[in-house]
Each structure stands twice: as C-alpha cells, then as structure tokens.
Amino acid sequence: MLGKVRPDRKGLRRAYQGLVLVSVLALAPMTWAWLSSTGHRAMAEGAGWLGRVPETQAALVLGAGVYGTRPTPMLARRLDIATDLYRAGKVRALLLSGDNSREEYDEPTTMRDYLRAKGVPDAAMVLDYAGFDTWDSCVRARTVFGAERVTVVTQEFHIPRAVTLCRTAGLETFGVGDDSSRRWASTTYAYAARELLATAKAFADAKLLHSEPVYPGPREVSLTRVLEQPPA
C-alpha cells in the first residue's frame, strides 16, 4: 500500500516567498510613480479645477495618436485642457511633444493645427517632433528646449508616471489629467492595465539605465523666445 505523499513544506515556503518577491518587484515601479507624484497632480473636472493648478512656464502636451490629420479623442481632450490652461493664464506656452518618426505620421503638427483652429496663436506653440515616449518628452523638454517648470497634460491613468518621469528629468512638474473613463471606459481600462509594464520600463529608463532620448539634441531656443515675449 502506497503511503500518502506529504507536501514539501520547505519547497512550498520558497515558492510562496518567490511569489511575494515577484509581486513586490512588479508593484514597486507603480508605487514609485504614485508616491512621487502625490501632491503634484489634479484632475480637469469640476467647476474649480483650474484653481487647483499652479502657474508654470509651459503645458507639456504628450502625443496620444493621430488619424491622418486628426487627433485621437484622447489627444483632443489633452489639447482642450491645454487650451483652458493657456486661456486662464496658467501657462504661457504650449510644448507639443509627439512622434514624427515617419513622414506620413506627424503628431506635433496635427496637435498644432487642432489648437490653431481653437484660436491658440502660433506664437504660443512650440513643437517637439521627437517625443517618442514619455521619458523622451520629459528629458527633451529640459535639455533641448530649456524648460524648468511645466504642467504635463495627459489622461488620469498616465498622470503618475508622466509627472514622476518629468520630475526625475529635473523639471518642476505639476500634472493635469483627463478622466477618460467617463467617455471611453473600455479603452481607458485597457491602457490602465498596460501602465504596469509601461511604468516598469519607465523606472528602468529613469532610475536604472539613465537612458538618453532617441534624439538628445541639439538645443533649441523656440521655447525661450516664447517665454521672453510679454504676456498677451
């Protein structure tokens, strides 16, 4: 008669400890982003949301996809928020950072054209054609365009990572987010789920590898010239 097989308690304990370690390592970047951005973010909702946003030099609007010459709905919301910030005197410039790695795909120009149609003057807009990801956009805002204080504009699920990366890049940063789940729930939840991996990569880029942007330079004076102009 075969005896009962007893579980290997030591093996089970090690497996449990390994699972705990993996869970901690997986959640550590999210915790880093959340804690580092606490007190430096607000949602663009409610009648008084602009009153919760400090004045900075520029709104750093991060690209979020375009359909030909039209911004995606999420990007359009970011641009609407940036327009509100500009008209309220919360920022003096709009730094439009996005992907133009292919001739037929041009996020910054599409962003500019959308804002131009809303009445934002060209003189207030600066285009960064090499904002290929959030880290590149933040680093280039400081090292290429010379920004010191920015209000980064994106969706709520992205705000902790965006604010934390810009602060790590050396920018004094406040973030304003759009609660996209009210309009596009399924898309928002899908993007939010991807934040776990995206934040892990961001942590590696910013804290471990100290990655350089794809295009680290040269220095541009376009933002400086906008800020040197007298307020409108």
Give the ranges of each region predicted by the language model.
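N-terminal membrane-anchoring alpha-helices
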Residues: 1-53, 214-221
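A transmembrane-helix-recognition feature enriched in membrane-embedded lipid enzymes
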Residues: 189-212
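A structural signal for short, hydrophobic/glycine-enriched beta-strand patches
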Residues: 2, 6, 33-193
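Short linear elements at protein peripheries
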Residues: 210-232
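A general structural signal for short secondary-structure boundary/capping elements
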Residues: 102-107, 174, 196-203, 220-225
